[in-house]
């Protein structure tokens, strides 16, 4: 299937069920956002980083989808994204990883709609 967002939604919101046979299934947040925005009767899902004024987020258990609510765990349908390297990063890879964890990189991550995390 190829969509981690869909896998998360199906596993957490559909109680491990699947979409109806006639559902318009798409393979990216961008395609889902476009499909929702173009159909006034559409119901779909996108990552929090893709929410904007073209679509309306849905509250779950009274909590709106936001960076803050996802970060503090009160919005329950979330997933983590990871950066992985083969061994210790070096050269440009290390520079990129260092940037992502720098104050500027954390600001960029947040401005892009994602939740910055420090190094563990």
Where on the chain are the PLM-derived regions?
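Exported/periplasmic ABC-transporter solute-binding proteins
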Residues: 1-120
């Amino acid at each position: 299937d190829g969509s981690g967002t869909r896998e998360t939604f199906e596993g957490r919101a559909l109680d491990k069920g699947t979409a109806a046979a006639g559902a318009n299934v798409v393979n990216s947040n961008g395609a889902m956002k476009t499909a929702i925005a173009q159909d006034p009767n559409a119901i779909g899902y996108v990552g929090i980083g893709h929410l904007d004024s073209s679509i309306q987020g849905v509250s779950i258990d009274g909590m709106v989808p936001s960076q803050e609510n996802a970060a503090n765990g009160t919005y329950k349908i979330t997933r983590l994204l990871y950066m992985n390297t083969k061994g210790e990063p070096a050269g440009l890879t290390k520079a990129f990883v260092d940037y992502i964890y720098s104050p500027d990189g954390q600001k960029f991550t947040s401005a892009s709609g994602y939740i910055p995390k420090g190094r563990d």
